Amino acid sequence: MKDTPPTARDRRRRSGRVTSLLLAVLTLLATVGLTTGPAFAAPHAGTAPTVSAAIPQVPDNAVDAVAAMQPSWNLGNSLDAIPDETSWGNPPATKALFDTIRAQGFRSVRIPVTWSNHQSATAPYTIDPTSLNRVRQVVDWALADGLYVILNIHHDSWQWINKMATDHDQVLARYNATWTQIATKFKDEPRRLLFESVNEPVFDNADDTRKAQLLDELNTSFHTVVRQTGGGNATRLLVLPTQACTPEQNLMDNLAATMSSLHDPNLVATVHYYSFWPFSVNIAGYTRFDATVQQDMSDTFARMHDTFVAKGIPVYLGEYGLLSYPDYTHQDYVRRGEALKYFEALGHEARINGVTTALWDAGSFLNRNTLQWRDPGLFAQIKSSWTTRSGTASSDSVFVPKAGAIEARTLTLNPNGTTFRGLWQGTTRLTEGSDYTVSGDQVTLTASALTRLTGDRAYGINATLQARFSQGVPWEIKVITYDTPVLSDATGTTGSFALPAQFRGDMLATMEAKYADGSNAGPANWTSYQQFGTAFSPDYAGKAITLTPDFFTAVNDGAPVTLTFHFWSGATVTYHVTKSGSSVTGTNS
């Protein structure tokens, strides 16, 4: 689950996974140094597109059925919201929403549901009939569009299921009662409806062995309860997760053992993937989709394939995305171009490994009020990745200094199996030789072309180019005029501190924080590179960089901290802050 607000809930949901990922990161950092087109049309606002009424026939074989579900989409932050469907900022789901999803090429939807706020917490754990009927209505809308639907128990996982180790009998009784009611309500629905036992299951006060036992018990009990309700549930596809839906090898091995013990051909494995954690949240200097991040992705998908797919067990990647991108409520924490590379590569890895993927959308991709994609170019990249590769480049920007002679700039192309066809500005093709040159995988914009493209060299984006390839989505390149940013002295408090910043066309990539002795300062004391958004955040319109209360809570009183701000142009700017009680002073000298 990767959500838009509330962010506090995001941290609570991810705490177990972040801990395990952090340990892996610390191990990695001990040995690896830090490194720093044609669009798909969006539907018109408020208008449901025409959708074919053709209803797909579900293949008998589970592998073929799950393959037919590709691609998939999550109705996130809706029926899973707490306490009610609209509590987290999305409007109520409508039939028009599913019409849109179907028209945009999706073949299945995952409908997360949190039941606890609409259910008695004591026996017989009755689910409110009105809430159950509302879920049925939403499911039926999706089914009517010919979509496959995955229905689950969602945030209940950390509300009460997580207490199973210390309150075993009551948790299991409530879990079984919950699934008995759900399964009975939906037992006559078509086979295009799948049940998922529980989202991202976690267990408090238990060691790893006990956690594995508890999840095995839950998944096994889920299987028994659903099958015993009869009707379509006798052969319905059932989706079983690993602990926290994490795709680590030992956790997938545990799940494979559970599935083997059930002797049921109608089972589906599910995990989630939000990339290499430091890249996903922009911490520890992982600002780019670099070799380490790429390797994490390819290794993860290979594990899914080897553990399940190669053995005839289908995998449904129930959620994927990045933990901090996109989020329309604040500045991008991950660079858009680097995120585009991530989504392009993920589509490729899913295809070659036979994994069906479900985009986690809490409202930051599709605006559910207008039924339009918030970033059509981002969705175009995702949609293209379902069927083909796209070329990219080392950067989505070329930075040109404000003053002085303009010099040629070079980017490295990443064709990804395609062939580079040239550079365009709108409908105008640039001329190879005079505007740009190509040498191997290097494309160089000439000084004369950049002089023309930057015009009067006003700060910011002066021109947008496209690198076009033989297939896939063109790669956009922004030509940007900049100067090294200027930061000014400031005073404030630990609860409110913003240093004045003249960004001068540049954009912030990351921030380092160190004490005078060279040791790390800030919340992430295992790295000098602090987490974007958690420790600091730029305000381009307000011409400031904010240092958060969380940052100052972790800073030693009276100890000067040297901040190094890294910008996407390659420029770095040093700044100094000192906390004295609740007061903070900042200086650029």
List each language-model region with its residue ranges.
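N-terminal carbohydrate-binding accessory modules
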Residues: P38-R110
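Acidic/histidine-rich helix-loop elements
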Residues: L75-A93, A121-I127, T166-D167, P278-Q294
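Aromatic-rich peripheral "rim/lid" segments of glycoside hydrolase catalytic domains that contact
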Residues: Y328-T428, S434, G440-T444, T454-E476, ...
